Amino acid sequence: MKLTRRQFTNTAVAATGVLTASGINPAFASRNDQMNILCWEGYNSDGVLGPFRKANPGATVRAESGTSDPDMINKLRAGEINVWDLINLNQPWARDVLYPNNLIKPLDKGRFMPYFDKMLPEFAAPYPLAFADNGDLIGMPQRYGPFSFVVNTDKISRGMAEDEGWDLFLDSAMKGRYGVLTYDNWNVMHMCLTAGLNPFAPISGSDEDKFRKVAEQILGNAKILTDDLVAMNTAVINGEIDAYFTGGTYTASPARYDGATNIRGITPKSGPVNGKGGVVWIELTSAVNNPDPSILAEDFLEFVQQPDISKAVAFVEGTYNPVSQMGDPKCLAMFDSEELDAIQMDSLAEDMSRSLDYQVVSSYDKLIEIYTKARRS
């Protein structure tokens, strides 16, 4: 099955391949005229890389888009630490995996801490997961988004969806009226929350049974199962379904930007983990601990903090996302009213306050086995 932008796994992925396959020479040399970034899509776009290349004439700037966080991590573990200068992943990996294994290195606080002052309040504190336990700055946050579920507000009001939360999909009246966007890892997290469980704590015994029951019901009563967000949005627009399980700003924004503002990402008002029922992904970009580093790495990381480049990062590749730099009035002014509406800026702060940080799912191996069996049946 084709891997999609947010369909990441929590298990180790065997890394294979030759470093030169991407056209990058791993041999040590003076590399201050080179910069290589391993990233989610967007940072590899011409709208982001083009201006940096123009600002650094003669530099060779390359980017490769990954398919999952663990896959990108395993590239570094397999020896590509000698290739990459920056890595862009979701929030738990820098502190929990990359830094403890010496795969990334601290950033210059004197250079980068002032940028937190210009970020949205949720990040200006500054954002805790950007730091190692010893206080080192290990990543800069930029793109983010609440990610729970999506409804057609012409059929299900925003207020009702937020009040009911995940229970909406357990209502017998919803049978055959919704789809499941099959981003497996996210489905597992969301089914845990639907079952009243904390997806980031160990799950066993009777709690496994709760998860199994919910997985079977959610998957069994769905009208559509697909990992294609365009197909899912189209099904909502065409009236085939009224909602879809697993989704948010990232998936709803293309349809909203095209005028279908009745398609809305929903974050439950309450949930089983400290009163929260939503989950938010936040990307961090970190400096790889390359033994032959390039000065262009931190130059690029500082470059993407600029208002116009932050806007380019937010609106690329056919999906649109908020960025932490929108706390800077100069950056916010780059977005017009339609763009702000597409990313649901009106409720972002509220949605964030109701959301848990995405973390590694503790019992993933057991839960994905249950999920997969329920999906096949």
Report each predicted region and the residues it spans.
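Short helices/loops that flank or line small-molecule/ion binding pockets
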Residues: 50, 73-84, 99-101, 168, ...
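Mature extracytoplasmic/periplasmic domains
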Residues: 29, 283-351
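Early extracytoplasmic/lumenal segment of secretory-pathway proteins
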Residues: 30-97
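Conserved C-terminal helix/tail region of periplasmic/extracytoplasmic solute-binding proteins
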Residues: 342-377
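Ligand-binding "clamshell"
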Residues: 98-106, 134-136, 254-270
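Ligand-binding pocket segment of bilobal, Venus flytrap-like solute-binding proteins
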Residues: 179-183, 187-191, 199-268
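N-terminal secretory signal peptides and thylakoid transit peptides that target proteins
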Residues: 1-16
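Hinge/lid segment of periplasmic solute-binding proteins
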Residues: 73, 96-144, 159-162
